């Protein structure tokens, strides 16, 4: 199903040769209007410009060839239809489908195979139950606290703040994730428990951080003499320890085939987004994601937004050798989006083993980082322009702000100034500027792309979420790795459990290295 191995692809050989002399973005006339128009794509409310990437037509044709040799569209089709994509052949692995797309497939008319259709059907049933629940909960409660970790917090939190500016709401929303009790304490200080709905999210029902934070909140409710069962909601797998209606006001379900970092369109995101903005806004969010799911099956790379972005990322990572990628949204609403992308990209593709269980000899996920513009122009952009490492940048922007507040100063609005800065940074990174004073010299040739929509709405938020989900999936398919497990998370958790045993005096085995470290910090005597 994967075609040739990544390093065996003929297209890769051609790309390696092109990478020796990539297009010079600093050359006079390089960024002509013709190039800018030609190297752009408009789809599902977005316009994507990649004229400032170091690619030309020959390079793009070779990247298209690589997508065909690796059968990337076929792999995407298989994933959406419920094939076993989360696997390592010949070794113990999760061996399950990857069906986050099915959680929103029911909002459009899609022909799905059996397992995908079942998840879509169950997702619709859960959404309808959610609508009934929200009718009562939104009338009764003014505040919601979501307790979760990883994908149970990062994606929903990013999407909540993305939608907050365009969806009027009188609801207060808080997120508690860190096992550090100060995280829970600062939220407890801000809320009226009687007016608060607590949503606990854990697929297994046993995850350490949500369990500890749930206990802190349960103790707070007990101390106030309030009914826990009337204020707590669970989002978990069927049959998990949390799947217990006697302990919760309501229990919503998710499935093993939906990974945490891809779960924002399931009830993991549905309860908090629906409570905050209403059921209709949540459906609009799902519709945006579902539209990109369908679009991601477009065969031609230059007409397929997530595939094109994925392959430009492969070019920058594997052919030009850039180790990091910065994602810079010029929108306050996306202030937590890069943190979500760090998990979605690096937990998915930070792998060194192929799907055949073999060590790989090429680079996979870049380090993903970033912050909101224009703020970050006054922090790390100095390094992007004149540092020793070239960092590809993915700019995200909007032509109109969310809240409508603006002013005109010196002949332009704040929204215009914001967008002008986005464009200026992309051009400055690409073209650079020569100067006789070396301290004022900008080398240029730093690649970037620009993704723009009219305004950050619930539908656009859903589309943006799905765009990056599919971008990372396509890259994993190209590299031949399993983008859908996270074994790297487990070792530290196992050792932490042993160390907790030592600290509590109940260690089942000796762990001298840990004892030594604990004694150093006076945790053990």
Swiss-Prot record:
Origin species, per record, is: Chlamydia trachomatis serovar L2 (strain ATCC VR-902B / DSM 19102 / 434/Bu)
Where in the cell? Cytoplasm
Q: What is its main location?
A: cytoplasm
Q: What is this protein called?
A: Glucose-6-phosphate isomerase
Q: Cross-referenced NCBIfam families, in alphabetical order?
A: PRK14095.1
Q: Which residues cross the membrane?
A: none
GO MF terms here are:
carbohydrate derivative binding; glucose-6-phosphate isomerase activity; monosaccharide binding
Q: Which HAMAP family match?
A: G6P_isomerase
